[in-house]
């Protein structure tokens, strides 16, 4: 019973912290979703996914098979960023059933929006710089999906959502302090 209580303490805390972020995001932008990344405790993925969803958020990706998300370190295999952009039409053509997202800073995000990626995960861009960037990227491609990532937490989720992004990628709920719960045992 103690192990179950510990799991319940932790998962309830994750759901509660997630709910706080979802409420803050939706208050600022009802169309902005909170998305938790795959950087969770090993062996607890299924439980944490359930807790996140109970809190009102969604898993960013449950696995590599869901969405193609290209990070900076992947660009090496394409010959660098510029070579990746040149190959983008062919890459998108091979990802017939998948959306192609790329994590980028502000400068590269502009290039990627022009190149026609399905989505951009804008990494570590401060809120005050993100809002004008979102407007600029939407002017380039009104259909591009924009996700803010890097440092998104319950205290700033509303501010990030207010920039007009479609989603907030975060690991913050996974660091929730377990709730203080107890169990009472009674004879049958």
Regions from the PLM with identified roles:
Residues 105-106, 153:
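Helix N-cap/beta->alpha junction signal
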């Amino acid at each position: 019973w103690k192990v179950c209580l510990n799991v319940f303490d932790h998962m309830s805390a994750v759901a509660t912290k997630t709910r706080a972020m979802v409420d803050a995001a939706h208050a600022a932008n009802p169309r902005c979703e909170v998305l938790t990344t795959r950087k969770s405790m090993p062996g607890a993925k299924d439980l944490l996914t359930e807790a996140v969803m109970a809190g009102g958020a969604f898993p960013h990706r449950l696995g590599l098979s869901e969405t193609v998300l290209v990070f900076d370190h992947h660009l090496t295999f394409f010959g660098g960023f510029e070579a990746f952009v040149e190959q983008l039409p062919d890459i998108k053509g091979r990802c017939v059933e998948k959306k192609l997202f790329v994590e980028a800073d502000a400068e590269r995000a502009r290039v990627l929006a022009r190149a026609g990626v399905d989505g951009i995960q804008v990494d570590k861009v401060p809120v005050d710089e993100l809002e004008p960037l979102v407007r600029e990227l939407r002017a380039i491609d009104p259909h591009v999906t924009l996700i803010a990532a890097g440092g998104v937490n319950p205290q700033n989720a509303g501010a990030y959502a207010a920039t007009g992004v479609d989603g907030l990628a975060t690991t913050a709920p996974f660091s929730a302090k377990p709730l203080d719960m107890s169990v009472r045992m009674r004879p049958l």
